[in-house]
Amino acid sequence: KFAIEKGCNVFDDEIVDVAVNTQGIDYITSKTKTYNYDFYIDCTGFSRLLIGKLGATWNSYSDHLLMKEAIVFPTPQEEETPLWTLAKAMDAGWMFRIPVQGRKGNGYIFDSNFITAEQAQIEVEKYLGYSIDVAKHIKFDPGAVDRPWIKNVCAIGLSASFVEPLEASSIGTSINQAFLLARRMINYNEQSINRYNIEVNAIMENVRDFIALHYVSNRRDTPFWNKVASTPLPHTLQENLKMWKTRLPIADDFTSYTKKVLFNEYNVALVMHGLDLFDTDSILTQYNMLPDEVLMQIDEICKHKINFDRSKTIPHKLMLELLRHLV
């Protein structure tokens, strides 16, 4: 709707063939029509119909991220809308519960080497205490294309990358890709394309490492979690964890190739703290070395957060309803 309002033409059609030349994609054909344009954005999802024609290859993250399948299902909305989304560890993966308008969106992301989709459904129903209707069964290979931009084609979204939605990274990476592309499309050349690909690869390595960080766990109670314990971490994450064990992550640790990474020092510090990965004595020494003025400011911020008066706020569900009426 928004695109049409901005003057975009929408064609409800199905691609049957893609023709290439030395400049990239020459034209696209459907059963009834030929489409010929100067530049193409590949939004064909896992099919990668355009970027695949130009030789992009898939770099799988499956050596580090074990999830391969998911079942997705809705559940009724609760009386009050929670302020958070739930990610719960399960026997062979994890389950998400996301409150949306009128219902809850749910899914069990699992490693199919250990359970089937049917077994995943049984485990979910046992946890919830009632039956569910599986809306979709999804299979995927976590990873990213080596070159999301080749000649006159740029892959964005699922055609460029996908990892399990543990941190809802797909929308964020797509938005950042679009911003980067918008800045580099004017009079672009091979150097512009190469720089774009370097930045997007850095974004995806940041996502991969942050997801892998969540699995640095002492859990060993099922065959899947035993496998997780022996699964190698990405080399970049291994090196960073050695550094972060005795000092907090800082902004400079995340800006080597691009400023568009999704996850920064604050995200990493929260997860590492929850997983008890810090040497707290070393961190305390670092904290005590801060100037007195900074320590006083931190103390005031903490007091303000602790003494926050919840009675002066309105329920989250009511707030969302008011916002919807404003749009």
Where on the chain are the PLM-derived regions?
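Glycine-centered secondary-structure boundary/capping sites
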Residues: G55-A56, G129, G157, N307
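Residue-level signal for threonine
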Residues: N21, F140, N264
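Predominantly flavin-linked oxidoreductase catalytic cores and closely associated redox partners
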Residues: F2-L128
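Tryptophan-centered motif/residue detector
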Residues: Y40, W58, W94, W149, ...
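Long, low-complexity C-terminal extensions of enzymes
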Residues: R183, N187-V327
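FAD/FMN-dependent oxidoreductases across multiple families
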Residues: Q101, F110-R220
